[in-house]
């Protein structure tokens, strides 16, 4: 787990990719859920993606069912929901665990030196966001209630726009 680009993740179709595919991009990595009170954030996340993708922003959504069982669907059902309801075109990945013994390696890496505002390394709820610079540095962890629009300035600074 030397750097973020060596991380291997599964796309929603279960094919493996390394995050090296996103080298030199600004990344916003989010654990997502379809039946959460914060699910509406998909719309604003897609808005950020539409506005900044050409400038180098990639959004990586990792469905997770660990918080109130709010992501019960299969990868196909999740993708259908996101595209039909929110017109999501950013990357959606395989459903994972973000806490506990079966935490996905990408989230072990993200949480390691980036505690929440309360000081916990655990992900506290759906829609926790990690902002990663073009050189792979984790810039900031944002809590679930941080609206995507509130991250806009940080994204613009990293993209130099």
Region annotations inferred by a language model:
Residues 1-161:
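Chalcogenol-based redox active-site neighborhoods
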